[in-house]
Amino acid sequence: MITFISKFLASKSLTLNSQKSYLYDLQQFAEIIGEEVTPNKLKLYEQSLADLKVSAKKRKISAVNQFLFFLYENEVLDRFYKIKNKEKLPLLTPAYQEVDLSVLYRKIGDSKGQLIALLIVELGLSPSEIIQLKWENIALEFQVLTIVNEKVMRILEIPQLLLPYLEGEHKAVYLFDNKGEAYSRQWLFQKLNYYLASVDLSQMTAQKLREQYIIKEKNKGTAILDLTRKLGLKSPVTLEKYFKN
């Protein structure tokens, strides 16, 4: 059997490291099988792999099956034996997953911090867009709001879940109005962070909440180009990592 292992390796174009790996796996196989391949001996070999990790088991079985086919092809064996790997590699956990944010929809005292969080999670708005949002750009009766900046105008549908939180706000010039002026980004981050801490989500940030919006939209089946437009991005490049899984 050792002689045939050498011939098998010589027939393949392998790197030195791959050759060593094949040789090691096949020598172990030969120690258990001996000079004669039988179904019972193959079962013994399978049992010897029981405690190995799935990836290691898969590698060894692949090497042995290639070797068994080589033996059959060269008429060393009168039939082709094949070991079936019944185990599969565990599925990789997606890198980006939805987080349970149901707590954001519960009624609490800090309505402004809550609304900021919901505007990010439900519409994917950035902090800069939120502090510049005016009531004249919000049409509750049509369930739409308009985001206006120097380069582009976006019309976004207001989700039904978000409507009650907007309807309860006092209408002035800005959605978050500071005597007719917009608040600073620092004010927004302070309100948001205070609110998130109060609902035990201090690990979240404006960026992570926006990421949750992206993940949720992707899981709903929104195409990457449609999501690019919804977010007002110039290109889908920054979204590609979320669509790889």
Curated annotation (Swiss-Prot):
Chief location: cytoplasm
PROSITE patterns: CB, TYR_RECOMBINASE
Domain Tyr recombinase intervals: 90-245
GO terms, biological process: DNA transposition
Domain Core-binding (CB), chain residue ranges per copy: 1-72
Active site positions, chain numbering: 151, 210, 242 (o-(3'-phospho-dna)-tyrosine intermediate)
InterPro entries: CB (IPR044068), DNA_brk_join_enz (IPR011010), Integrase-like_cat_sf (IPR013762), Integrase_catalytic (IPR002104), Integrase_recombinase_N (IPR010998), Tyrosine_recombinase_XerD-like (IPR020876)
UniProt keyword annotation of Cytoplasm present: yes
Keywords, alphabetical: Cytoplasm, DNA integration, DNA recombination, DNA-binding
Subcellular location: Cytoplasm
Disulfide bonds: none
GO CC terms of this entry: cytoplasm
Keyword Cytoplasm: yes
Domain of life per record: Bacteria
Family that this chain belongs to: Belongs to the 'phage' integrase family. XerD-like subfamily.
Function statement: Putative tyrosine recombinase. Not involved in the cutting and rejoining of the recombining DNA molecules on dif(SL) site.
The protein, known as: Tyrosine recombinase XerD-like
Protein source organism: Streptococcus mutans serotype c (strain ATCC 700610 / UA159)
Top-level taxonomy: Bacteria, Bacillati, Bacillota, Bacilli, Lactobacillales
